[in-house]
């Protein structure tokens, strides 16, 4: 998934501001109580709104606001995408999987150094990943069994992190972006 740890400020989720901490394969989400935010309108005046005043808005990116209905619609779309990915994973269908990859994902997981790092991290020693197909078979398929969408976090109006709760932890299972009206996996 996302290489290297980073903290990303994201949307309001159930009245709390969440921070996503990415790691090599999984991430976690921690939340703190919301603070009053400053929003700049087009006329240049700064208005201060509490989260209660913006109850219908879950994220803002410049002048673009993601509403609760946008959130629910996007979550439903991503539940369908993840259901398709679950079937593809169960069937080990490499060619159908390729349809869901962004160009950046294909490039990243075709790079020799990334494939070598992934080979070194595999529990089964002696497996050498040489191609994207090897990554799919030995890394993606075993790590993406029965994924579900418990929540989503908007990184931008088109980029979303898919979160699954497991064992009391929130796990980042997919970074995904809407590209030309289709959801594509990001590295």
Curated annotation (Swiss-Prot):
The keyword Thylakoid does not apply. It is a lipid-anchor. GO terms for cellular component: plasma membrane. Its main location: membrane. Residues 1-17 form the signal peptide. Keywords: Cell membrane, Lipoprotein, Membrane, Palmitate, Signal. A lipid is attached at residue 18 (N-palmitoyl cysteine). Coiled coil: none annotated. It is found in: Cell membrane. A lipid is attached at residue 18 (S-diacylglycerol cysteine). The keyword Membrane applies. This is Uncharacterized lipoprotein TP_0503.
């Amino acid at each position: 998934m996302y290489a290297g740890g980073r903290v990303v400020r994201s949307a309001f989720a159930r009245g709390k501001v969440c921070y996503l901490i990415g790691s090599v394969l999984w991430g976690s989400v921690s939340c703190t109580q919301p603070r009053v935010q400053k929003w700049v309108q087009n006329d240049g005046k700064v208005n201060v709104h509490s989260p209660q005043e913006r109850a219908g808005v879950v994220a803002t990116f410049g002048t673009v606001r993601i509403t609760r209905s946008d959130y629910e619609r996007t979550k439903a779309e991503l539940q369908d995408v993840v259901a398709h990915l679950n079937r593809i994973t169960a069937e080990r269908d490499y060619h159908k999987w390729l349809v869901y990859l962004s160009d950046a994902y294909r490039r990243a997981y075709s790079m020799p150094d990334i494939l070598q790092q992934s080979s070194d991290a595999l529990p089964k020693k002696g497996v050498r990943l040489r191609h994207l197909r090897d990554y799919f078979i030995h890394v993606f398929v075993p790590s993406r069994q029965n994924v579900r969408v418990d929540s989503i976090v908007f990184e931008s109006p088109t980029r979303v992190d898919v979160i699954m709760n497991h064992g009391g932890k929130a796990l980042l299972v997919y970074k995904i972006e809407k590209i030309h009206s289709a959801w594509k996996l990001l590295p």
